Amino acid sequence: MDPVPSSASHGNLDEQIAQLMQCKPLSEQEVRGLCEKAKEILMEESNVQPVKSPVTICGDIHGQFHDLAELFRIGGKCPDTNYLFMGDYVDRGYYSVETVTLLVALKVRYPQRITILRGNHESRQITQVYGFYDECLRKYGNANVWKTFTDLFDYFPLTALVESEIFCLHGGLSPSIETLDNIRNFDRVQEVPHEGAMCDLLWSDPDDRCGWGISPRGAGYTFGQDISEQFNHTNNLKLIARAHQLVMEGFNWAHDQKVVTIFSAPNYCYRCGNMASILEVDDSRERTFIQFEPAPRRGEPDVTRRTPDYFL
């Protein structure tokens, strides 16, 4: 085991977290130092990262910093609450930089109390289209912070397993994956590929139709109840929890309550009018959804994005 960081470095990190909680970005140099520490922690985590309950499971955030602050207000501060985030921290919202920096800082400060999975937006290619790249340029005057973060994204775990029974990931299942060991055995440290198992985990969606289907997203697959039932049976799972899709109530059951979608960005893109939710799993593995609405905004710019939408 590495030695625990000294209290001096904790103090510095606590100051950075306090600054980020006020939605003030760190310097480029501070981001670089933070991401170096985060990489050392994330390198040790598994493609299927084990997580103990109690835990609060969260879906997409998409740079909606004030709503993330609201999430922590409702769900409890980290480290008081153990958190599991299922990806898509950046793009679309106005504060991707502050959002992802805060989550990474919390990971470095409390590595056992927060798990950050990779979403399909934690990728070099997607962030160049949907806002994170442009935001880094605007806030730092160059692309260095974007590069630092997208290099770090390669190390984020792809999935998590809560108490051996709730399988958590951003997107969904893959026709090339039958078991959790299949996932444990591949090399995740790379840009999200255009196809194949790793791509599918971050891009696929559950569907009402049986079997595998072609995804309208152009990546991943749709998978039916027969597929999720087989996967859950093979791997001794009770539930698949995933994010990746806007759901108006903040959560949505599928496949006879064996798959749930959790979405944690209320009024998505500042215009969708949806609720957000988080899923609390307690010591006895009882599950409770907590829904929330957007945090009150003061003087926030009205962001109109010129980027294409995919709400599918």
UniProtKB/Swiss-Prot annotation:
Record-linked CDD domains: MPP_PP2A_PP4_PP6 (cd07415)
InterPro entries named among the record's database cross-references: Calcineurin-like_PHP_ApaH, Metallo-depent_PP-like, PPA2-like, Ser/Thr-sp_prot-phosphatase
Gene Ontology terms, MF aspect: metal ion binding; protein serine/threonine phosphatase activity
Keywords, ordered alphabetically: Cytoplasm, Hydrolase, Manganese, Metal-binding, Protein phosphatase
Note accompanying the cofactor annotation: Binds 2 manganese ions per subunit.
SUPFAM superfamilies on file: Metallo-dependent phosphatases
Active-site residues annotated for this sequence: H121
Cofactor entry: Mn(2+)
GO BP term, example: mitotic cell cycle
Chain positions recorded as Mn(2+) 1 binding sites: D60, H62, D88
Enzyme class, spelled out: hydrolase
Residues where Mn(2+) 2 binds: D88, N120, H170, H244
Keyword GTP-binding carried by entry: no
Subcellular location: Cytoplasm
Annotated Gene Ontology cellular component terms: cytosol; nucleus
Catalytic activity, EC: 3.1.3.16
Reaction equation(s) it catalyzes: O-phospho-L-seryl-[protein] + H2O = L-seryl-[protein] + phosphate; O-phospho-L-threonyl-[protein] + H2O = L-threonyl-[protein] + phosphate
UniProt cross-references to Gene3D superfamilies, sorted A to Z: 3.60.21.10
PANTHER family in UniProt: SERINE/THREONINE-PROTEIN PHOSPHATASE PP2A-RELATED
Protein family: Belongs to the PPP phosphatase family. PP-2A subfamily.
Name of the protein described by the UniProt record: Serine/threonine-protein phosphatase PP2A catalytic subunit
Organism in which the protein naturally occurs: Nicotiana tabacum (Common tobacco)
Taxonomic path: Eukaryota, Viridiplantae, Streptophyta, Embryophyta, Tracheophyta
